[in-house]
């Protein structure tokens, strides 16, 4: 079984913030494949189902971003999921808006949610899907930017970006990380270089 985990923050006020892109991708997969992500388990909302013939668990840790590992590690242990079948999906301020980068391993690169996951699993060999959110112009505070609502003018691009990311995650489960990297490590089609 795959564990497809989107990182984010619980609460309506964060629902459409850049920091919650991971949650939005999990929601898109849930919608596409009729999986209800409503069951509480190990400080996460989870849903079990099938994507393209593969058993999956979709998860949205409810611990707040910086404690994500506190939810995912017990969840994996309880359900006996191999770490090679974990895919973590999250926002990345180091990448431009609309860029997607799949990596099979590596550091957290300053992302506190991923840092927590690496600390709990005691390995950096974790597949991750990084979703670029940098607006292409200087920002005063990264912390404020990632928690503020995404602009209404960006909603169409957001929808396309989330769909592109969901397809990337599907490809990881169906065809493997290498093929997914070849197909999806780029900007989502139809997105502008600058913030709208």
From Swiss-Prot:
It is an enzyme of class 3 (hydrolase). One of its GO terms (molecular function) is tRNA binding. SUPFAM superfamilies: Peptidyl-tRNA hydrolase-like. The active site is at residue 19. It comes from the Bacteria. Its EC number is 3.1.1.29. It is found in: Cytoplasm. One of its GO terms (biological process) is rescue of stalled ribosome. Pfam families: Pept_tRNA_hydro (PF01195). It catalyses: an N-acyl-L-alpha-aminoacyl-tRNA + H2O = an N-acyl-L-amino acid + a tRNA + H(+). Gene3D superfamilies: Peptidyl-tRNA hydrolase. TRNA binds at residues 14, 64, 66, 112. Keywords: Cytoplasm, Hydrolase, RNA-binding, tRNA-binding. The record marks 9 as: Discriminates between blocked and unblocked aminoacyl-tRNA. GO terms for cellular component: cytoplasm. The record marks 91 as: Stabilizes the basic form of H active site to accept a proton. Monomer. Belongs to the PTH family. Hydrolyzes ribosome-free peptidyl-tRNAs (with 1 or more amino acids incorporated), which drop off the ribosome during protein synthesis, or as a result of ribosome stalling. This is Peptidyl-tRNA hydrolase.
